[in-house]
A protein has these predicted regions:
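Short, glycine-/Ser/Thr-/acidic-enriched flexible segments
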Residues: 97-99, 178, 192-193, 210
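Core regions of eukaryotic protease modules
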Residues: 1-91, 96, 100-105
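Long, positively charged binding patches that form subdomain-scale interaction surfaces
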Residues: 69-168
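A short macromolecule-binding patch
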Residues: 195-206
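Conserved small/polar residues in nucleotide/adenosyl-binding loops
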Residues: 225-227
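Long, low-charge, small-residue-enriched segments that form tightly packed helices used
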Residues: 203-205, 213-220
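Catalytic nucleophile-His microenvironment captured as a short glycine-rich beta-strand/loop
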Residues: 161, 166-193
Length: 227
């Protein structure tokens, strides 16, 4: 059986374990956390299903066939902001395979390099002389912020349908910050260890990156009372 296979290669599943000097079963440990998971809801935003209805997001890791509420993109982002501004945090699931995701540099960005109209005068003059590859090399030095893609529902959908946006990783959104240009970022707690970057395991994901690369978010239901 599958259980026998796991027992052979991973060891027998313990019925009890000790944490901080106290013995638990999996169920008693879950109960000790004080979380009622019925108070949490999963939200997503895609155009190939009707808004304001539930559907199964078509990603390999959704093996439980979980259904998520489909909201317009701006409303999904609004819910995340409301949660973070009102004492809640947000569970985030999304794509971390892009070069713009740099845990080492503590940032995740979605740079706009095809159009240079929004660049400052100095950067625009330099970037107009570069091809797209050279522009990306400059941006991915992560030395300063550059303009980012305006992510519409259509842009987001194209990334999902082309498998450019995939179901890679889950992290914890804990706050909101802005850079010197006023660009919004989501303060994000990663699970890859506190020693692997100089930010204690955190990074800042830009608004454009989150709009483009989110598969779904999970929030407390009270994060939706305003809509």
């Amino acid at each position: 059986t599958v259980d026998n296979l796991f027992d052979t290669y991973l060891g027998k599943l313990p019925e009890k374990f000790t944490y901080q000097g106290k013995e638990y079963t999996p169920k008693t440990f879950a109960a000790s956390l004080g979380l009622n998971m019925d108070n949490y809801i999963e939200l997503t935003s895609f155009t190939h299903h009707p808004y304001y209805q539930k559907f199964e997001v078509e990603v390999p890791d959704n093996w439980e066939h979980a259904q998520m509420y489909n909201l317009p993109l701006n409303e999904m982002m609004e819910v995340a902001d409301y949660a973070l501004n009102n004492g809640y945090t947000v569970c985030w699931d999304g794509d971390v395979s892009e070069k713009g995701f740099s845990f080492k540099n503590g940032v995740a960005i979605n740079p706009e390099v095809k159009k240079v109209e929004d660049y400052s005068t100095t950067d625009r003059a330099r970037f107009e002389k570069m091809d797209e590859k050279e522009r990306l090399e400059e941006v991915y030095k992560f030395e300063k912020p550059f303009p980012e893609v305006n992510v519409t529902p259509q842009v987001r959908q194209e990334g999902f349908e082309a498998f450019v946006t995939t179901d890679d990783h889950l992290m914890h959104l804990t706050g909101i910050a802005k850079d010197q240009n006023g660009t919004k970022y989501y303060i994000t707690k990663n699970s890859w260890g506190t020693e692997r970057n100089t930010f204690g395991g955190y990074l800042n994901m830009s608004d454009s990156f989150v709009r483009a690369k989110t598969i779904y978010i999970m929030v407390h239901k009270l994060s939706l009372i305003h809509i």
